[in-house]
């Protein structure tokens, strides 16, 4: 009787040894074989059923909001969203702490003040000028956190939201002469 022919499976590491001479299995490298059987499988690049046109596959492109079938309605217009983004309720107040900088600025009796969050920073300047009794020809310089001078059209609520201290107060430093920058 002759020995049966040697048969190979698709994986050369899983071949059946012949009956005549035992051969050791080929050495396995830890870098080529996965360490565990729970390794993620490699996705095949087989074309989908809907790719019948014969063209090469195109990369996945993001869908626009109007082309998506998952959305039940389109989001609000960006301008409408931005118009309401900076609005504050009329009854919301912001606590402002006034600090004099330098020797030329007089101290206030009440350094804490509540101002409506919807008002512009020019209302803070007008309040301070009125409280200090500053004339029309004199200047007052205001700074947030002793760092920068905001524009007069900034909303006080936005400044408070971005620059309030750990006590929830907006620190406004003031001087009769330029103090910072």
Curated annotation (Swiss-Prot):
Its topology with respect to the membrane?
A: Peripheral membrane protein
Polar residues bias locations: 1-12
Primary subcellular site in the record, as a coarse category: membrane
Q: What keyword terms does UniProt attach to this protein? A: Autophagy, Isopeptide bond, Membrane, Protein transport, Transport, Ubl conjugation pathway
Residue ranges of region Disordered?
1-64
Gene Ontology biological-process entries: autophagosome assembly; autophagosome maturation; autophagy of mitochondrion; glycophagy; piecemeal microautophagy of the nucleus; protein transport
Molecular function as annotated in GO? Atg8-family ligase activity
Fetch the SUPFAM superfamilies from UniProt. Answer: Ubiquitin-like (SSF54236)
Enumerate composition-biased segments (Low complexity): 29-43
Annotated cross-link Glycyl lysine isopeptide (Gly-Lys) (interchain with K-162 in ATG5) - which positions? 181
General function of this protein: Ubiquitin-like protein involved in cytoplasm to vacuole transport (Cvt), autophagy vesicles formation, mitophagy, and nucleophagy. Conjugation with ATG5 through a ubiquitin-like conjugating system involving also ATG7 as an E1-like activating enzyme and ATG10 as an E2-like conjugating enzyme, is essential for its function. The ATG12-ATG5 conjugate functions as an E3-like enzyme which is required for lipidation of ATG8 and ATG8 association to the vesicle membranes.
Similarity comment: family membership: Belongs to the ATG12 family.
This chain's protein is named Ubiquitin-like protein ATG12
Q: What organism is recorded for this protein?
A: Pyricularia oryzae (strain 70-15 / ATCC MYA-4617 / FGSC 8958) (Rice blast fungus)
Traced from the root, the source organism's taxonomic lineage reads: Eukaryota, Fungi, Dikarya, Ascomycota, Pezizomycotina
Q: Which gene encodes it?
A: ATG12
């Amino acid at each position: 009787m002759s020995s049966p022919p040697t048969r190979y499976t698709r994986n050369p590491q899983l071949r059946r040894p012949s009956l005549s001479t035992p051969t050791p299995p080929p050495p396995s490298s830890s870098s080529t074989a996965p360490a565990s059987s729970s390794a993620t499988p490699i996705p095949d690049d087989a074309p989908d059923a809907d790719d019948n046109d014969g063209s090469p596959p195109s990369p996945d492109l993001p869908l626009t909001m109007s082309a998506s079938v998952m959305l039940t309605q389109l989001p609000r217009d960006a301008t409408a969203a931005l118009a309401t983004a900076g609005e504050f309720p009329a009854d919301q107040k912001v606590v402002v702490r006034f600090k004099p900088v330098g020797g030329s600025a007089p101290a206030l009796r009440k350094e804490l003040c509540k101002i409506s969050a919807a008002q512009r920073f020019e209302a803070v300047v007008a309040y301070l000028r009125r409280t200090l009794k500053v004339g029309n020809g004199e200047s007052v310089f205001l700074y947030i956190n002793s760092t920068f001078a905001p524009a007069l059209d900034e909303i006080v609520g936005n400044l408070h939201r971005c620059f309030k201290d750990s006590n929830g107060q907006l620190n406004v430093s003031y001087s009769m002469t330029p103090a910072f920058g």
